[in-house]
Every structure is written in C-alpha cells, then in structure tokens.
Regions:
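Cofactor-binding beta-sheet edge motifs in enzyme active sites
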Residues: 2-761
Length: 761
C-alpha cells in the first residue's frame, strides 16, 4: 500500500515534532541519554548494590530489577524480569522487583514512536529519520507510562542490555578473583563457572562487581534462550490468591482517613452552594472540603465537594446526604443525538485530514470506465466507559513539605507532576508508591483522581486520606472511549475486484484532550488514533482515500483498550465483508486475495480458519483480521441467533506478535481481550441526555458474565521477529467477527454498536 503521500502528512509529522521539541530545551544539541544508567539511584535496601540503573544484587544472590511499568493484569511483573533473568543467567525465582525511580531512562520510548502516522509498509527515509528524531525527543521527555501495548516492545533492548551488562560485570569480577581471562568463563543459575570446575555465586561477587569493567557485552541469540519463549508461571498469581497483593484500595498508611465525593451530574457543571451543617453531625464525619481549582482541564472528575470521615461507608453516606446546589452550565442540553448530528453535519461539509491517498478516488467515484457497482455504508460506535473492577481511588498525604501518594496509576510521571502542583511542592518532594492496578484499560493514564486526592489531603491536617469513587461515580465521570461515525464508499468492477475504497470518519480527538489536560499543550493538528487501523491496514486497492474530521464536544474522552482500533476494526472489517458479499465471493477467499502481498497476515488468517473448522448446524462463523500495536490477529467467532438474542459460543484467535516472550501470558491476554471486546460489542454504550451520562452501574452498563463467555482458543504463530504488543490487539476484531457471523445467519447487516437485532429490518 505504497500510494502517493500527501504533503499535508509531512506537515503533520514535522509540525508534531515542532510541538514536541518545544517541550525540551536544547534536545537537538544534547546527546541522547543512554538507558543503562540514570541520575536517580535504585531504591535498594540492606546489602544490595546497584550494577546499573536497572539491576541490583544482594549478597545472597537476589537480583533486584527496576519495574518501570504498572501491573494491571497484563503480566509485566513476569515478562519484564524474564528479560533480565535471561541475560544474567539467573532463575526467575531469584529476581525481586523494585519500583523504578522517576528517571528518564525508564521513559516509554516505544509508545511515543508508535504514535507516528506511518503505515507498517513504509520503509522510506522520512519514516526512519522521523523515528530517530522522536526517539531522541522521547529519551529527553522520559515519560514513564504504561499503555499502547508497549511494555515488552520498549523493554526488549534496555532490560536485556541491563542484564547482560550486569552479567559481564560479575564475570569480570570473577576473572579478577581467579586471575584469569574473562573470555574463558561461563555463567549458569546465578554462578560464574571456571573450566576447572570452580564456581562463584553472584552474591559473593556483588561488591567487587560494582567497580568491575565489563568486557564485551553480548546479547543472547534466539537459540540460546532458556526462559524467553517458554511458558513461565505468573509471579503475581500467589499474592493475588492469598490476598497479600497490594492494589491502590489496599493502601493503609497509619492514621488514614477516607474521602467520598459528590460531583456535578452535568458535564462541566459547577458547585453553586453547599450546606454541610447536618452532615458534619453524622457519625465519623471529620470535614467537608472543596477541591475546586485542583482538577486538570476537561477530565473525568467533575467539580464538587468531598467528605472526609473515619470510614469509607461513613464518608459515602455523608456525601450522599450533602445538600448541594449545582450550576449546570452550558452543557445542560447536551445529548448523544446532538453529538451524532454534529458528526454528520461536519462529514457533509468538511473534507477532513487525509491520512492516506493512493490513485485517484475522485475519478473512480465519477464512474470511471470499468465501474460496475458502488457500495456505500455508514457505521457508528458509541462512547464507552472503562468499567475496571477496582474503582477509581488514590491515597495521599500532605505533611511537612512533602506529598506522599499511593496510586494504581498507569502514568507515574504525570502523577508526580500533578501531585507536586496541587500539593504546592517540588517534584523532588513527592513520594509516589505505584500499587497493582485492578484493571486499567487506559482510564488510569489520566491522573484526575490524584489531583482530587491531593487537594482533599491538603485540607486533612496531615492525615493520609484515601479517596474512593463508587461505581456510580466511576461510570458517570469517566474519560470515555470516543463515539464515532464513519462513511464508506467502494467501487467494484464486473469481476468483483475493488477499484476504489473511500472512508471518511468523524469523532473527537483523544490526543487533543489528553495532552491538553496533562501537558498543557494546545489542541491542534491531526490525531493518528482517530484513523488507526484504517489508514494503515494491509488490504491493497488501486485507488484509496482515508480521511478523518475531528469534531470536538464537551464530553471528556480518553484512551480505552485498543483506542481507535476498537471501533475502526469494526467499521473496516464489517465493510470488507460487505464488499465480499457484493462481489459474490466467500469472505475468507476475498481477504486472501487482498492479502497476497502480505504473507504474515495471510498465515494468521489461514491459521484461525483452519483451527475453527466448520460451524455446527444452526451456527455460523464470522471472520475478522486486524493489526494493531504491531500484532496481527485473526478471529473466527462461532455465533447463533435465537429471536433477537445473539450468542457467541466460541472464538478462535490466531496471533502473530513477533517472538512470543511468554506464551502463557499471550494466551491470557487473548482471552481477556476477547471478553473485553465482546462486552463492548454486545452491550457497551454510554449515552448522554440533558448533559448527564445516563448509565451508572452494571445494571445498565453490563459486561459479559460467566454464562455468556465464549470458549476462546488461541493459536500463537511461531516468529523470530521483534516482540510486539499483546495487551490490546485481541479486542478490536471481536465485534466485526460477531457481526459478520450474524449477517451469515440472518442476512441483516449490523452497522452500529452495540450489536442488536432489535428493530433491525
């Protein structure tokens, strides 16, 4: 798909770099900071010594590894230390994790580079040059973030290099001890081994290794791996089973109080007045406080007040009893219907930003010679909540010129910044403890709850305060997955070949909102997430155009598991099925024709179809193929329909994610992604009426239950390619696979999410 690239795209890239460069003073003349050694020491205790910025070792041989990413079920507490253990030649059981300090070497470079608007097939100088420059910028920014299915991809080189360097230092120390050449020594199971049978434990060499000069540092080859590529048990499972795992809501600093909030029910509303006299007499109530002015702009948390009490139940009951009057503000008439109408109007009037162009779509749409049929369709997707099992929470203490924060956050860097700002201290005086996350899905990339908690704690006379949102607070004050509207048009010749493919969509921009509220950047320019999965797809057409119109609304939006792929995969894979039907071709055969130049994608599709076999009587198989975060996923959904009820019995999920670091975790993430995507496909919808979110809890924002969960079969294709993301790629293909199966069964094309047959003619 190497069509002509527009000058606008280059302006977008270079303009984006200019904005990013403006954040960094002199990044162009400062050598990039290496990722091996940082400026902040590792938080090691006892007799442990640091061998580099990532790795420390104790006298007993325990290896301490810095953990810069948040564990929210995706398995980083297992997969990332595997990289160090592999290169150090130590058992995984010998590794303990320590929270990475707020240092630039732990910044997520891969996530920022993945945000560039390049097609996977691009191999030109522009892509390589821009990627190189963005890498330099990313190193200087040092944003510590967990998201974008980037943890393994980003850590693959620096954490292996850290382990290999530590091993080389230990070998050098042993060579000095034995007065021999380091080249003749080898390592295994936490020991340096001499050819004559002598061995020294790493722990015994730790102190001397600190000053050792490593010789050649060589990373292992694929065939030398002993841990990587083999199933390893999850390190976090025992603590989750026995109850010792610490999530945000489990933080218990001495003297802790609790806080509950009352937030404006109308988006953008403010507090008019509060009468707290009666509430202050309620059992356990300590204080009623206002946190106005502390929140980032246009975030999930709404304006309001908080009640501080001696238990959460006391705080929540008092918050509900507060007599609060609200100023509804300018969004009191906002509705989902009005937002979709605005999308449609803008699509009618504006061309939007062209993310990809090939050939001449205008000529094809003008009924050029050979056009036998035109297919048009309009698709839509709703706002979605994150609905993580652990409710939004944060614990904070402001005392003696320091701010202590305990948070289940995906953005430690942003959390430190906002805690310092709201707490009135420097970032050096913020102590952040990142706990496990009971689900994140992108919601905890935002730090509105940290700002809120610190603002409340600042008024708690030095006591730590744990702020907890109820499920209703969470559902009605999320940063939602954007709603979207997409229009498709395609032309076919008499043989069913696609001559032209046009897609124009409309939605809000997550990036505009997110970077405004977290970095203060003014909104502007295109946003790759609005068109990802469309402009960079692997289907080839001689004439093609992918455009997007950004249409802002007052609804706060944020990153949601798989981001733009979550709806663009539904739009694209459903429309591809429509084209197969219009061409009179089998949907799988049609895709195979389109993937002739992409053997990896074709192999994934074939693997899923082969594993799925033939659908039983009364059921149908729907197919979808989508690439996101570097990973190719094909899914076959086995579906039945009874009346208007859609039932998904089985999903086969074939995956090419590059080298499979831990196949167990990959299979787990595939299963998780399928269930998460199925919840959105069948049930997920947040609607706005009179400026308020209408849904409040699982009774009206349901998720897939155990009796509704399909059997998930995962096929992991072998690969020696660089590891790619796995936390999100299994989510996007679910909805189109199910919708395509429903069409086979009923002849009804479902073009709106959530999927429903009610009222469909």
């Amino acid at each position: 798909m190497q069509g002509a690239k527009s000058k606008g795209r280059r302006r977008f890239i270079l303009g984006g770099l200019a904005v990013t460069g403006a954040l960094v003073v002199g990044w162009g003349v400062t050598p990039p900071r290496q990722r091996l050694n940082g400026s902040h020491p590792l938080p090691l205790g006892g007799d442990s010594v640091a061998l580099n910025g990532w790795v420390g070792i104790d006298k007993d041989g325990t290896v301490s590894v810095a953990m810069p990413r948040s564990e929210m079920g995706q398995g980083v507490y297992t997969a990332l230390p595997m990289l160090v253990a592999e290169e150090m030649d130590v058992p995984l059981s010998a590794v303990r994790l320590v929270q990475a300090p707020n240092d630039k070497i732990f910044g997520n470079i891969a996530m920022l580079k993945d945000g560039l608007p390049f097609h996977p097939d691009d191999t030109g100088r522009l892509k390589s040059s821009v990627s190189w420059v963005v890498g330099k910028v990313a190193r200087e920014l040092g944003l510590i973030i967990t998201g974008g299915s980037s943890s393994i991809k980003d850590a693959w080189e620096p954490m292996r290099e850290a382990g290999a360097t530590a091993r080389a230092m230990l070998v050098a120390a042993a060579a000095a001890e034995w007065k021999t050449d380091a080249g003749g020594l080898r390592t295994a199971d936490g020991h340096v081994l001499h050819a004559d049978g002598r061995k020294l434990a790493y722990g015994a060499l730790a102190a001397k290794a600190v000053d050792a000069k490593p010789g050649e540092v060589r990373l292992k080859s694929l065939r030398e791996f002993k841990l990587i590529g083999r199933p390893q048990p999850r390190r976090d499972t025992p603590s989750k089973v026995n109850g010792t795992a610490i999530f945000g809501i489990d933080a218990r600093p001495p003297g802790m109080l609790y806080a509950a909030v009352r937030m404006s029910p109308v988006i953008g509303g403010t507090v008019a007045s509060v009468d707290s006299a009666a509430v202050l007499k309620m059992p356990g109530v300590v204080k009623v406080v206002n946190y106005d002015g502390a929140l980032p702009e246009r975030t999930g948390a709404g304006a309001g007040v908080a009640v501080i009490a001696r238990s959460y139940w006391q705080a929540k009951q008092a918050a509900l009893a507060l007599d609060v009057k609200w100023n509804d503000g300018p969004q009191a008439a906002l509705s989902s219907a009005a937002i979709y109408a605005d999308f449609a109007a803008k699509l009618d009037k504006e061309d939007g930003y062209a993310y990809y162009k090939a050939g001449d779509m205008d000529a094809v749409e003008g009924k050029a010679a050979g056009v036998a049929k035109t297919v048009r369709a309009e698709y839509r997707a709703p706002f979605l909540a994150h609905a993580a099992m652990e409710p939004v929470n944060c614990t904070a203490q402001v005392k003696d010129g320091k701010v202590h924060v305990w948070a289940p956050t995906q953005s430690p860097g942003f959390a430190v910044e906002v805690a310092a700002k709201v707490g009135g201290v420097s970032t050096d005086n913020v102590v952040l403890t990142v706990t496990m996350l009971g689900g994140g899905f992108g919601r905890r990339l935002d730090v509105d709850m940290v700002a809120q908690a610190v603002a409340v704690a600042r008024q708690a006379d030095g006591h730590p305060v744990q702020l907890i949102w109820s499920r209703e607070d969470d559902t009605t004050h999320d940063v939602y997955r954007p709603a979207a509207l997409a229009r498709f048009s395609a032309t076919l010749d008499a043989k069913g070949n696609v001559l032209g493919y046009d897609n124009k969509s409309a939605s809000g921009s997550i990036s505009h909102q997110f970077f405004k509220r977290n970095l203060g950047l003014p909104p502007g320019g295109p946003d790759k997430t609005t068109a990802e999965g469309e402009f960079d797809m692997q289907y080839h057409f001689p004439n093609q155009r992918i455009r997007h119109v950004i249409v802002d609304s007052a609804v706060p939006i944020g990153y949601w598991r798989s981001v733009g792929h979550s709806h663009n995969a539904f739009f694209k894979e459903s429309f591809i099925d429509e084209l197969a039907h219009a061409a009179g071709k089998d949907s799988v055969a049609f895709r195979r024709e389109l993937l002739a130049q992409h053997p990896r994608h074709l192999a994934v599709l074939n693997a899923a179809v082969a594993k799925a076999g033939t659908a039983p009587e009364g059921r149908a198989h729907g197919v979808a193929l989508h690439q996101s975060f570097g990973t190719i996923v094909a899914q076959v959904a086995e579906v039945s329909v009874e009346g208007t009820e859609i039932r998904v019995h089985r999903v086969v999920c074939a995956i090419d994610c590059g080298l499979a670091v831990n196949p167990n975790i990959i299979a787990q993430q595939a299963e998780s992604g399928v269930v998460f995507g199925l919840s959105a496909a069948l049930f997920g919808a947040v609607t706005i009426k009179d400026g308020k979110v209408e849904q409040s809890n699982f009774h009206d924002y349901p998720v897939v239950r155990l009796n509704q969960a399909p059997e998930v079969e995962t096929v992991i294709l072998p690969s020696a390619e660089h590891p790619e993301g796995m936390g999100e790629p299994a989510t996007p293909p679910v909805a189109p696979a199910v919708a395509n199966a429903v069409f086979k069964l009923t002849g009804k094309r479902l073009r709106s999410l959530p999927l429903t047959l009610q009222g469909v003619a």
